[in-house]
Amino acid sequence: MPLPLTSLAADGPRLSPIVAGAWRMADWGWNAQQRLRWIEQCAELGVTSFDHADIYGGYSVEALFGEALALAPSSLRERLQIVSKCGIKLVATARPQHRIKHYDSSAAHIVASAEASLRALRVERLELLLIHRPDALMDADEVALAFEALRAAGKVAHFGVSNFTPAQFELLASRTPLVTNQIELHPLQRAPLADGTLDQLQRLRIRPMIWSPLAGGALLTGQGEAERRVQAALARIAQRHGCASATIAFAWLLRLPSRPVPVSGSRRIEALREALDALRITLDAQDWTEVWQ
């Protein structure tokens, strides 16, 4: 079912309104054909954008995805938009030279990471590359040079950041065009609603991407007092709208005037359908606030 692609910014990439996240793919225990079938099912629903990072699965997920994608016909591969991230260096078997987890936003690392992602994913271009986390040692001019080199080489079309504060975003945006800030946001993590993150993006007409829209599942199954309060509100509103509680959680995000683009992290196609159902629901202010309170 084709879904209209949506722009993250005036000159930004066009992504599906819900993005499929591959973060946990290494834990799914699937062979390449099963991974390909998941990609196909996502695309059949109109979800053609996939969110990655070099570090996912201990530096293994991009290669798992690429192995599956290599089995796909070109007609499918050409429909997909691939997002990846770089800038975190984990202690991992695949990176024995890393003594501690740290950040690296040097031009050399950004370029090398993007090129490694392209090889692992078996694609020629990333639609969007994000700096994964703020780096206290980030030289904004150096990052801008790396972005321009990757853009000029045709290896990355657009650039953004993830988990940046408004001041950090403003600094890097003063040197190079940014098209999104991918942040954590849900009814249990509401800081971006008050710390200026969403206000800044709305002012710039740049849409945020949202990771962990269901709080890692806590919005549906968490046992804490706050989790249960939100679950009860979601259930009441879902009953009124005749949909799943997860659908209301996504609709709560989509109601925001900054027009977020959520990343669904589930391997379950039914969970993706529930996220997509939110595109047909507009919560009124009372419903939205009922989840907030």
Show which residues each predicted segment covers.
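N-terminal binding-site loop/beta-alpha segment at the start of enzyme catalytic domains
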Residues: 1-81
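N-terminal small/glycine-rich loop or linker at the start of catalytic domains
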Residues: 9-27, 83-101, 125, 130
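Acidic (Asp/Glu)-rich catalytic clusters
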Residues: 9-14, 44, 68-81, 118-122, ...
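Short, acidic/polar
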Residues: 29-42, 105-121, 165-169
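A structural motif
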Residues: 47, 123-126, 156, 178
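Active-site groove signature of glycoside hydrolases
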Residues: 118-137
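Beta/alpha (TIM)-barrel catalytic core signal, keyed to glycine-rich beta->alpha loops juxtaposed to Asp/Glu
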Residues: 134-293
